[in-house]
């Protein structure tokens, strides 16, 4: 369910990280436009490789009852290039919740890839894994990402505040949530 995971959409192939993705993921997270909206440092190539090996190990440990981390590469079918990543995992500031996250190369923004990839992942999470609720957090300045979440049916819950000092980078983020019922209703209406 997690190790051999594959999703095909009209334009994308979504699959677990592979070590051959390291240099593309490294270049992606170095893009200033992308990194600006990610509350993490820019990692070295070696650190990216370590994250990939760790992600492969996590996929072996993931289960329907507990997703430790589910990191996925987004490949554009036409070019066969890695253009981004998405995934599911515990929220850093609310460990009991599963969070959707994604990032795409700046040169692909505005083409609907984020919506296409995350919609497919949510469909899998709700219909196959059996999750009931998924959250997402986004910086208020990231209007394009807010639009993606709203298009998917996520509803704004609150602004993240009063976190402990070690989580200060998440302070002020907007917290969104979607239920299985709402997502599947929205999918039927399309």
Predicted features and spans:
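A short helix-loop-beta-strand connector motif used in the catalytic cores of GNAT acetyltransferases and
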Residues: 55-73
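Acyl-donor (CoA/ACP) binding surface of acyl/acetyltransferases
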Residues: 1-36, 71, 75-190
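Conserved GNAT-fold acetyl-CoA-binding loop/helix
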Residues: 33-57
